[in-house]
């Protein structure tokens, strides 16, 4: 879901590593320890929560989180909570990073001091205000200046303890006066529409002929200001909660025209002062924020076409895609957008086959084949992550969940054994888990995605052709990816592959480490199994599996997934779990009588049906076949005064659902839309609001079967595994190429040097793989030209946007301290990425 701007789409995403907290304040009790967790928030909306780390003042989280950001935001915030079993969890402190400051910490481990949390630290939102001066002639013939203050609306106010019933006080304040008025309370909304006008007398009556129109005395206006305070009406004994304030000096009204603008709410001037840094501890984070500005598809045609023909270039090292891998500092930087682009256009197998064959030809020892972090290895890794994730889940998730839930001790290192544990019993537990994992993997070959099988076939053929005397190389070329880079890492760190929601506990993590090591060795088909382990206890344990049947099972599996023309007969028939989780749904009114209330339910989506049940594992209460989903669209907040709602439209009715946050709502809408995209009866129009009290709230039509009044969005690809935007990936490649332009130019110089000089070359030139200098130079020239053309388009867009930008508009409210930073970014830095 992109934020639409004139002429382009803006995509925001963030990748976060939450490391650890240190030196948290002690608990005021005899135990002194705390049970803490960390949340990730867009402004104050929670989008992710870590597991609870018990009894620690230095909790280690080690959790990763990635999301596409579906809306604008000002701060990326992190809150450390102390869990309380009997009361509401208490906040220890927070880290708030301004959006414009995220680039300062880009992809760097950084320690942040925790800050205190109070009403002033939580201020957010903006107010639409209009001020107008008017003259009133009294009965005695004198003139009074009166100020009309109109508060129209607010947006994005903070939600306090799960509710927001806001009202505003409007005060005309000066050295010798303070006159306050109050709006009505708006219930259950943090986007209140007030539209109330308040009048204040701002000058003493004076003769009409004394001064010109609106020429009131300077000492009056210079010392007066309008202050708007937002409050949350509360029934608690502690009184109403402060939400924020703004102050407008009346100097802005020296012109005859009215003043109308948006303002950001600010904390109070006399707000509570935070304690000195370090009092609350610190939090280690690594944040990567990306913002892509994507033009329409035709802008990218030259660069995209150049990239897509990479597989056909001879030699492949002279292709645009291979050149990108050469200039990037990390091969993975290039591999991620390249693989996604090639998958989108069906060119990933030819490209990987070409670069793999070239790498095999350069390899001298069959024992080191595909063992480095080359562009080939990184591209295959990325392909397996994208195309093989559902396969991985179907194969491993049930067994991984069983291991996590069993809590059986599998420690076989005599030094690590706990008191009372039996080495023989632990070894048997571990053997059973390894056998189970090995069995599900080697029996899963028929389910391996076709694109992976086609790549494995090309690896097998290239390796066998290069090392004809080594009969095992056709297996090791494939096992180095499917076992060493796919299954073994997923077993070792299941949370990174969404097999578990969080990091596992230390005992389970140790078990998975031992299982992963054994599976990796079994899959490698190493001739000397015992030498594969540094630890003697692992070598002893491996004797359980030193039988020919294990090697035969691995070879049969590798033969199956690397066979030419193999297709997956289960790809359509087999139910695949796509997404599941708790959400809140509104009763659909299937019964004639009964309340249409809201209930928390466990939702489950497969490629066959969308169901909900009371709890995970319970029988379904209701099922919607995928073919009956006619549209999936957002539901306007005003329908039920609830955020993050969407609707799943069926032939008879719509199912209204509330997700936990905006990120989760986007994820559900996207996956439901994708899986139902090919339905023949999909709607073209829908109702963006609910049908309540005998009419649609959006168009006021009275019939519940009335045709929709707004066009459906849709437009996503039908492939349930892959949601790839080709233009966005080309934009990312442009961004990378632009940032590495100096290395592209150096590579051009290296091509020229090699064309005319055969002697020793400069050290910086020797890092590039250049098999054909003339062909490589030709491609480089085209890449530089394509990047330059896009650079000009971005520069023109920045200039146009700069001219349109208005301080005080809804997009750039007054009081935004980042506005000058925004102006500087628009005039100095590239617009394609932050």
UniProtKB/Swiss-Prot annotation:
The keyword Repeat applies. It comes from Bos taurus (Bovine). Residues 346-561 form the Ras-GAP domain. GO terms for molecular function: GTPase activator activity; zinc ion binding. SUPFAM superfamilies: C2 domain (Calcium/lipid-binding domain, CaLB), GTPase activation domain, GAP, PH domain-like. The modification Phosphoserine is found at residues 77, 809, 833. Residues 806-834 are annotated as: Disordered. The lineage of its organism: Eukaryota, Metazoa, Chordata, Craniata, Vertebrata. The modification N-acetylalanine is found at residue 2. Residues 818-834 have a biased composition (Polar residues). It comes from the Eukaryota. A zinc finger (Btk-type) spans 679-715. This is Ras GTPase-activating protein 3. The keyword Phosphoprotein applies. Residues 1-112, 123-263 form the C2 domain. Gene3D superfamilies: C2 domain, GTPase Activation - p120gap, domain 1, Pleckstrin-homology domain (PH domain)/Phosphotyrosine-binding domain (PTB). Zn(2+) binds at residues 687, 698-699, 709. The record marks 371 as: Arginine finger. The gene is RASA3. Inhibitory regulator of the Ras-cyclic AMP pathway. May bind inositol tetrakisphosphate (IP4). Keywords: Acetylation, GTPase activation, Metal-binding, Phosphoprotein, Repeat, Zinc, Zinc-finger. SMART domains: BTK, C2, PH, RasGAP. The modification Phosphotyrosine is found at residue 66. Residues 576-677 form the PH domain. The modification Phosphothreonine is found at residue 110.
């Amino acid at each position: 879901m992109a934020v639409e701007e004139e002429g382009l789409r803006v995509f925001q995403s963030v990748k976060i590593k939450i490391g650890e907290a240190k030196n948290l304040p002690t608990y005021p009790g005899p135990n002194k320890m705390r049970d803490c967790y960390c949340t990730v928030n867009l402004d104050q909306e929670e989008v992710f929560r870590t597991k609870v780390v018990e009894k620690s003042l230095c909790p280690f989280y080690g959790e990763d989180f990635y999301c596409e950001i579906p809306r604008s935001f000002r701060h990326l915030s992190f809150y450390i909570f102390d869990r309380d079993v009997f009361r509401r969890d208490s906040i220890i402190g927070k880290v708030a990073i301004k959006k414009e400051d995220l680039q300062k910490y880009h992809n760097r481990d950084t320690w942040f001091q925790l800050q205190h949390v109070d009403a002033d630290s939580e201020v957010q939102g903006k107010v639409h205000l209009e001020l107008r001066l008017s003259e009133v002639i009294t009965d005695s013939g004198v003139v009074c200046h009166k100020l009309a203050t109109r508060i129209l609306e607010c947006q994005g106010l903070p939600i306090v303890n799960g509710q927001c019933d806001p009202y505003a006080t409007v005060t005309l304040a000066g050295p010798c006066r303070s006159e306050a008025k109050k709006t009505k309370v708006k219930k259950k909304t943090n986007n209140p529409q007030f539209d109330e006008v308040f009048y204040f007398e701002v000058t003493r009556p004076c003769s009409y002929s004394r001064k010109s129109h609106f020429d009131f005395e300077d000492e009056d206006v210079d010392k007066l200001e309008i202050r708007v305070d937002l409050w949350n009406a509360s029934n608690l004994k502690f009184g109403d909660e402060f939400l924020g304030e703004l102050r407008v000096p009346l100097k802005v009204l020296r012109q005859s025209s009215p003043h109308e603008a948006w303002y950001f709410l600010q904390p109070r001037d006399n707000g509570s002062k935070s304690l000195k840094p370090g009092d609350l501890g610190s939090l280690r984070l690594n944040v990567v924020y990306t913002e892509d500005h994507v033009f329409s598809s035709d802008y990218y045609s030259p660069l995209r076409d150049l990239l897509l023909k990479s597989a056909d270039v001879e030699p492949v090292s002279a292709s645009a895609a291979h050149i990108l891998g050469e200039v990037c500092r990390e091969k993975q930087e290039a591999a991620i957008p390249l693989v996604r682009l090639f998958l989108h256009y069906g060119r990933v197998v030819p490209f990987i086959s070409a670069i793999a064959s070239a790498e095999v030809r350069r390899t001298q020892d069959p024992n080191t084949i595909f063992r480095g972090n080359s562009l080939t290895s990184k591209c295959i890794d990325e392909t397996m992550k994208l195309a093989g994730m559902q396969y991985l889940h179907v194969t491993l998730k049930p067994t991984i969940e069983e291991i996590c839930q069993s809590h059986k001790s599998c420690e076989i290192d005599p030094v690590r054994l706990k008191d009372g544990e039996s080495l023989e019993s632990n070894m048997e537990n571990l053997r059973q888990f390894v056998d189970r994992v090995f069995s599900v993997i080697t029996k899963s070959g028929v389910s391996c995605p076709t694109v992976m099988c086609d790549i494995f076939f090309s690896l097998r053929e290239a390796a066998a052709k290069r090392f004809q005397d080594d009969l095992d190389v056709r297996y090791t070329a494939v096992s180095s990816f499917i076992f060493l880079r796919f299954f073994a890492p997923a077993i070792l760190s299941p949370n990174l592959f969404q097999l578990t929601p969080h990091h596992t506990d230390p005992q389970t993590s140790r078990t998975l480490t031992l299982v992963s090591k054994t599976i990796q060795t079994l899959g490698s088909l190493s001739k000397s199994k015992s030498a594969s382990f540094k630890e003697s206890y692992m070598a002893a344990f491996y004797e359980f599996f030193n039988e020919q049947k294990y090697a035969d099972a691995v070879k049969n599996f590798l033969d199956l997934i690397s066979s030419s023309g193999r297709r997956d007969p289960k790809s359509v028939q087999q139910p695949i779990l796509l997404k599941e989780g708790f959400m809140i749904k509104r009763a659909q009114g299937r019964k004639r009588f009964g309340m249409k209330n809201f209930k928390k339910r466990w939702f489950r989506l497969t490629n066959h049906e969308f169901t909900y049940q009371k709890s995970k594992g319970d029988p379904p209460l209701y099922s919607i076949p995928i073919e009956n989903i006619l549209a999936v669209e957002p539901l306007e907040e005003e329908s039920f005064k609830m955020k993050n709602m969407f609707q799943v439209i069926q032939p008879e009715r719509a199912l209204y659902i509330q997700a936990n946050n905006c990120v989760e709502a986007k994820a559900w809408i996207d996956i439901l839309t994708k899986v139902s995209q090919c339905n023949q009866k999909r709607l073209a129009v829908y109702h963006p609001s609910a049908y309540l009290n005998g009419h649609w709230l959006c168009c006021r039509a009275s019939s519940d079967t009335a045709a929709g009044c707004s066009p459906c969005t849709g437009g996503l690809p039908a492939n349930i595994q892959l949601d790839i935007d080709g233009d966005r990936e080309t934009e990312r490649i442009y961004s990378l190429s632009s940032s590495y332009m100096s290395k592209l130019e150096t590579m051009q110089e290296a091509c020229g040097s090699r064309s005319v000089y055969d002697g020793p070359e400069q050290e910086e030139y020797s890092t590039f793989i250049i098999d054909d200098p003339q062909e490589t130079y030709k491609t480089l020239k085209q890449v530089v030209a394509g990047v330059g053309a896009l650079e000009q388009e971005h520069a023109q867009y920045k200039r146009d946007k700069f001219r349109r930008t208005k301080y005080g508009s809804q997009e750039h409210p007054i009081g935004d301290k980042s506005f000058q930073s925004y102006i500087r970014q628009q005039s100095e830095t590239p617009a394609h990425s932050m």
